[in-house]
């Protein structure tokens, strides 16, 4: 039997997301997935697993609501932000009729989730400054139900101007939802727009424990919006989305003690990023290092294929961005421990000596 005859046409044509782990590599230093370099110290309490979990764990909802300073009715717990991205399309978009919009170069799952669900996606490239092209957005917004933007943006590391997000919210009121993915916001927490949920009924914010909380392996995220949107999404989400072990560890991570630990680690990592970038700025093999407020930064090399190959062969795994919109010769580097950063510097210095000799 030819199984392709049974598969939906749009799935046959789909180019799947390449996760950091699926790409492979025999790495000792993993700087390709924007994970926090230090593991969490949480451990499971004694829980029974013979009963199904709550649909939405009350303790976890209350803990996250307290952390953000909003009411729990405005929160939906999801299996990472990826489930929330897909859930919004399932709930609000009619296949082959409605559209979503996103702004490349950015996180690929906005586009891929739409394609899986047979919903048209419109990619409006960011400007050279990696900011929104509002004029082009407004000219192409007809039929768009969901607009996804990542802030700070992945892979560029910059913040989208708050006034531009507000302009989008105002222009699309009553027509579309603006979905702001704040996966990396703890690294620049003062720039969150969560509090705008009270003012704008078409705002949805996505958050996660995968990055600053050092819980990428847990798969726990949060969708924040007004209670009417939460109620609609609750009709569509799976009946038991959050397992008891996930709920337990996620709730523990939101205790005052563990939030203090997270904030302290974020402060240290931000200092490491500044130091790391400073070490790289004078290298001949580098064209540009783009400013970042997240736990990663984007580097444009003169020859990114050579750099990627050298790092790979030395078991340092980074993320090639050459196929992304307007990112030729670019590599995204996650900020690791100081020792991991030193290893990157050591390899790049060796490459740099070749460039110095050529320039002479």
Swiss-Prot record:
Domain of life of the source: Bacteria
Classification via SUPFAM superfamilies: PLP-dependent transferases
Any Gene Ontology biological process: L-histidine biosynthetic process
Protein name from the UniProt record: Histidinol-phosphate aminotransferase
Essential cofactor(s): pyridoxal 5'-phosphate
A Pfam family reported for this protein in Swiss-Prot or TrEMBL: Aminotran_1_2
Encoding gene (name): hisC
PROSITE patterns: AA_TRANSFER_CLASS_2
Record keywords: Amino-acid biosynthesis, Aminotransferase, Histidine biosynthesis, Pyridoxal phosphate, Transferase
Class of this enzyme: transferase
Alphabetized CDD domains for the sequence: AAT_like
Pathways per UniProt: Amino-acid biosynthesis; L-histidine biosynthesis; L-histidine from 5-phospho-alpha-D-ribose 1-diphosphate: step 7/9
Reaction(s) catalysed (UniProt annotation): L-histidinol phosphate + 2-oxoglutarate = 3-(imidazol-4-yl)-2-oxopropyl phosphate + L-glutamate
Subunit structure: Homodimer.
Family label: Belongs to the class-II pyridoxal-phosphate-dependent aminotransferase family. Histidinol-phosphate aminotransferase subfamily.
Molecular functions (GO terms): histidinol-phosphate transaminase activity; pyridoxal phosphate binding
PANTHER family: HISTIDINOL-PHOSPHATE AMINOTRANSFERASE, HISTIDINOL-PHOSPHATE AMINOTRANSFERASE-RELATED
EC number: 2.6.1.9
Positions carrying N6-(pyridoxal phosphate)lysine: 211
UniProt keyword Transmembrane, yes or no: no
């Amino acid at each position: 039997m030819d199984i392709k005859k049974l598969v939906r046409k749009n799935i046959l044509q789909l180019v799947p997301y390449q996760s950091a782990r699926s790409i492979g590599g025999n790495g000792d230093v993993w700087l390709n997935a924007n994970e926090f370099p230090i593991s969490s110290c949480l451990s499971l309490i004694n829980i029974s697993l013979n009963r199904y979990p709550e649909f939405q764990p009350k303790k976890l909802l209350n803990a996250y609501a307290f952390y953000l300073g909003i009411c729990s009715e405005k929160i939906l717990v999801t299996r990472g932000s990826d489930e929330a991205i897909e859930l919004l399309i399932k709930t609000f978009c009619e296949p082959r009729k409605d559209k979503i919009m996103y702004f490349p170069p950015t996180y690929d799952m906005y586009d891929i989730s739409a394609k899986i669900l047979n919903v048209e996606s419109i990619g409006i490239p960011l400007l050279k400054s990696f900011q929104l092209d509002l004029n082009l957005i407004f000219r192409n917004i007809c039929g768009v139900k969901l607009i996804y933007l990542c802030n700070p943006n992945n892979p560029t590391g910059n913040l989208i101007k708050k006034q531009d997000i507000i302009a989008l919210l105002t222009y699309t009121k009553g027509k579309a939802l603006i979905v702001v993915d704040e996966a990396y916001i703890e690294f620049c927490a003062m720039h969150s727009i969560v509090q705008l949920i009270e003012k704008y009924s078409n705002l949805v914010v996505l958050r996660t424990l995968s990055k600053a909380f050092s819980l990428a392996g847990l798969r726990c995220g949060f969708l924040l919006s007004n209670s009417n949107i939460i109620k609609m999404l609750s009709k569509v989400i799976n009946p038991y989305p959050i397992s008891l072990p996930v709920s337990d560890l996620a709730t523990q991570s939101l205790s005052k003690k563990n939030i203090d630990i997270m904030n302290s680690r974020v402060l240290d990592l931000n200092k490491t990023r500044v130091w790391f970038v400073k070490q790289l700025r004078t290298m001949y093999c580098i064209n540009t290092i783009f400013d970042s407020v997240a736990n990663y930064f984007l580097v444009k090399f003169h020859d990114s294929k050579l750099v990627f190959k050298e790092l790979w062969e030395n078991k340092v795994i980074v993320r090639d961005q050459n196929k992304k919109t307007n990112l030729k010769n670019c590599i995204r580097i996650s900020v690791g421990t100081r020792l991991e950063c030193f290893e990157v510097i050591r390899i790049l210095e060796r490459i740099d000596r070749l460039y110095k000799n050529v320039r002479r």
